[in-house]
C-alpha cells in the first residue's frame, strides 16, 4: 500500500535552503539533489520501513533515510497509519535533537 506524503513546512524550507546552498556552486548538482529528494520521499511512500530509527529517546518514533546519491542529506520522518509525515530534511552534520527541542 502506498501511503500519502505530508511534508511539514519546516521540511519544505529545509529543501529550499539546501537547494539554494548547492546551487550557489553547481546548479546541475542542486537540480539532481532536488530530484533525488523527491524520488527518495516517493520511495518512503511505498516502503516506509526502509529508513532507520533515530537513536535518541527524546525523538521516539522518528526515522531517517539518506537522500539517494546525497548520503549526507537526511530525511527525517514519522510513519503514521495512512501517511508518511516528513518532519525535516537536514544535512547529517546538523544537531537534530537540538533543532527539534528548539521548535517545541
Predicted regions and their residues:
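Basic, Lys/Arg-enriched alpha-helical interface segments
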Residues: 1-62
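Enriched for short, Lys/Arg-rich terminal
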Residues: 67, 71-104
Amino acid at each position: 500500500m502506498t501511503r500519502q506524503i505530508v511534508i511539514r513546512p519546516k521540511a519544505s524550507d529545509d529543501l529550499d535552503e539546501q537547494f539554494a546552498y548547492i546551487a550557489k556552486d553547481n546548479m546541475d548538482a542542486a537540480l539532481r539533489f532536488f530530484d533525488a529528494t523527491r524520488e527518495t520521499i516517493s520511495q518512503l511512500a511505498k516502503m516506509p520501513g526502509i529508513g532507520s530509527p533515530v537513536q535518541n529517546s527524546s525523538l521516539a518514533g522518528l526515522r531517517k533515510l539518506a537522500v539517494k546519491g546525497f548520503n549526507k542529506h537526511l530525511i527525517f520522518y514519522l510513519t503514521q497509519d495512512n501517511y508518511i509525515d516528513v518532519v525535516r530534511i537536514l544535512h547529517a552534520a546538523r544537531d537534530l535533537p537540538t533543532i527539534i527541542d528548539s521548535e517545541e
